[in-house]
Curated annotation (Swiss-Prot):
This is DNA polymerase III subunit gamma. ATP binds at residues 45-52. The gene is dnaX. It comes from the Bacteria. SMART domains: AAA. It comes from Buchnera aphidicola subsp. Schizaphis graminum (strain Sg). Pfam families: DNA_pol3_delta2 (PF13177), DNA_pol3_gamma3 (PF12169), DNAX_ATPase_lid (PF22608). SUPFAM superfamilies: P-loop containing nucleoside triphosphate hydrolases, post-AAA+ oligomerization domain-like. One of its GO terms (cellular component) is DNA polymerase III complex.
Length: 363
């Protein structure tokens, strides 16, 4: 059975299908339409935002048999070979595993050979920031005056580690992290196409926990599909991610602001038996604190878009607590989350963070 993971199955095969990178797609497409073809592109951004996908589309656009175009045909031999990853003139190099200058020089020595059957020989150097200083120096000489038949695409998740001399010789595009809305809509589209049942709340959680990465979102979605036999529901999704249910997160936040440490510790002990990611408890509490703070500051506006669960109780909490205390708790939880991994165990860390917040609340 030829099963394809979602990230490969749904990889965009045209610039029009790229999500969340409108400006970059427009700039690259216009460059091809105007015949202004740069010799080197630098694509930077976090994981799963489309760097490799855009690089492959650039390679197809440069080498499509109908001509240089922003709309490659996908039917010619070159387009199909690039999509399958078997094109001899599109060379993908993982810089993380080829950091030595000797290896880079060996690659660069071959660039003077003409393409086997394409218009251009395209080199994609992924994670280029991993190259050594000597490797960058070797690459710099080629980037200054490359042969006419050579194009470079550099991809990185850490652009600051790339020397300025390299960056200045490339057309640099900084890819944005994807919005939760874009990720949610795409996941929804995939599930509808596949005829899967799903809970929109579960998709919203997956979209949020993907942290702007479409690949992470698709991997989480695939995990959820396997767990629930293609029926994505809220219960399985929260258990999969180790997220406390909203009721527990709300009650912990309520007890915190009421300075009721006894009830808070009893609930934490109850939660510990379920088996959750402890940092997720802090994250969900911070969400409630954010909602309470916004309701406190903008009651008329925020009330219209506020979550419906526990609405009356949340309004009461907002009325009974000062902006200072709400902000203070948020700040302590935020700092505590960063330092949680230094505690002897995460449960102990969360308990101490919440006790500190209770101690510092002013009445």
């Amino acid at each position: 059975m030829n099963y394809q993971i979602l990230a490969r199955k749904w990889r965009p095969q045209s610039f029009k299908k790229i999500i969340g990178q409108k400006y970059i797609v427009k700039a690259i497409s216009n460059g091809f339409s105007l015949g202004k073809i740069h010799h080197a592109w630098l694509l930077s951004g976090t994981r799963g935002v489309g760097k490799t996908t855009i690089a492959r589309l650039i390679a197809k656009s440069l080498n499509c048999e109908i001509g240089i175009t922003s709309l490659p045909c996908r039917k010619c031999t070159i387009c199909q070979e690039i999509e399958k990853g078997i094109c001899l003139d599109f060379i993908e190099i993982d810089a993380a595993s080829r950091t030595k200058v000797e290896e880079i020089r060996e690659i660069l020595d071959n660039i003077y050979y003409t393409p086997s059957k394409s218009r251009f020989k395209v080199y994609l150097i992924d994670e280029v920031h991993m190259l050594s200083r000597h490797s960058f120096n070797a690459l710099l000489k080629t980037l200054e005056e490359p042969p006419q038949h050579i194009k470079f695409i550099l991809a990185t998740t850490d652009v600051e580690k790339i020397p300025k001399t390299i960056r200045s010789r490339c057309l640099h595009f900084k890819l944005n992290i994807l919005s939760e809305e874009d990720i949610f809509n795409f996941l929804k589209h995939i599930l509808k196409k596949g005829g899967n049942n799903f809970d929109e709340e579960a998709l919203k959680i997956i979209s949020d926990y993907a942290n702007g990465s479409m690949r992470d979102a698709l991997n989480l979605l695939e995990h959820a599909m396997h767990l629930s036999k293609n029926n994505i529901n809220l219960k399985n999704t929260t258990e999969m991610l180790g997220i406390p249910n909203k009721k527990h997160a709300f009650l912990l936040t309520k007890f915190l602001l009421e300075q009721d440490s006894k009830k808070m510790m009893c609930l934490l002990n109850k939660i510990s038996k379920i088996g959750l990611e402890w940092q997720n408890i802090l994250i969900e509490m911070m969400r409630f604190l954010h909602h309470i703070a916004m309701l406190k500051s903008y009651p008329k506006i925020w009330n219209q878009i506020f979550i419906k669960n526990n609405e009356n109780e949340i309004k009461k909490i907002a009325e009974n607590n000062s902006k200072y205390n709400i902000q203070l708790c948020y700040k302590i939880l935020l700092k505590g989350r960063k330092e949680l991994f230094f505690s002897p165990n995460h449960k102990m860390g969360v308990e101490m963070i919440l006790l500190q917040a209770i101690t510092e609340i002013k009445r």
